[in-house]
Design a protein with these regions (language model features):
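Active-site-proximal beta-alpha core segment in soluble small-molecule metabolic enzymes
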Residues: 73-200
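A charged N-terminal "starter" segment
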Residues: 1-132
């Protein structure tokens, strides 16, 4: 994809919802393309945002969080929209939440400097990608979820071979019986918390 231009970015088939056979155009030329939601010119599924509703929702949710002394990190994986990430951050969000290191990289390229990965990061390629992002972007803060000692050992094993890798910031994920992820029992959570605290990774 071309280098970003925040004032008049180039849009093209690499973006969700852009006609795959159409030539790239600048945002300023988008309206001249004559595409309509009703004439099947745009691929589905497609989300359409009303500016007034978006502005209202951003204000409302940020106010809701602030009144409760909460930091908000809205989930970016659904939209994968750098423009929306910036709007959320400008409205006061602490950071943006992603599900994968790939999604995080898109956010970082768009200027996100605080993020959560709401997932367990443990594969060598993902750990290497995260370490590279942290090394290349001074001040970047990212935390990911850990829900087992086994995952922690995988992270430690990778880091033992990567002496220059930064120490990772993690959050202990609590789960519920029958849930998909997270530590299920109090004793297990305490044991994992102690292991995380003692870990060099």
């Amino acid at each position: 994809a071309p280098a970003p231009d925040d004032t008049d970015p180039l849009l093209g088939p690499w973006l969700k919802g852009y006609p795959p056979a159409a030539e790239p155009v600048r945002r300023s030329a988008l309206a001249r393309q004559g595409w309509r939601l009703t004439d099947a010119a745009l691929p589905f599924p497609l989300a359409v945002l009303r500016q007034s509703a978006l502005a209202h929702n951003l204000r409302w949710l940020q106010t809701f969080a602030a009144e409760r002394a909460l930091d908000l990190a809205p989930h970016g994986k659904t939209t994968m929209s750098p423009g929306l990430f910036r709007r959320q951050l400008d409205a006061g969000a602490w950071g943006i939440t992603f599900a994968t290191v790939f999604q995080l990289a898109v956010g970082v390229a768009a200027g996100v400097r605080r993020a959560l990965i709401a997932n367990q990061v443990q594969q060598p390629a993902d750990l290497a990608g995260l370490a590279r992002l942290l090394a290349r972007h001074e001040g970047l803060r990212v935390a990911f979820l850990v829900d087992s000692v086994e995952q922690l050992r995988q992270v430690e094993a990778w880091r033992a071979t990567q002496r220059q890798a930064p120490q990772f910031e993690v959050l202990l994920e609590l789960g519920i019986p029958g849930g998909r992820t997270g530590v299920r029992a109090h004793d297990g959570a305490v044991a994992l918390g102690r292991a995380l605290h003692a870990s060099p990774a």
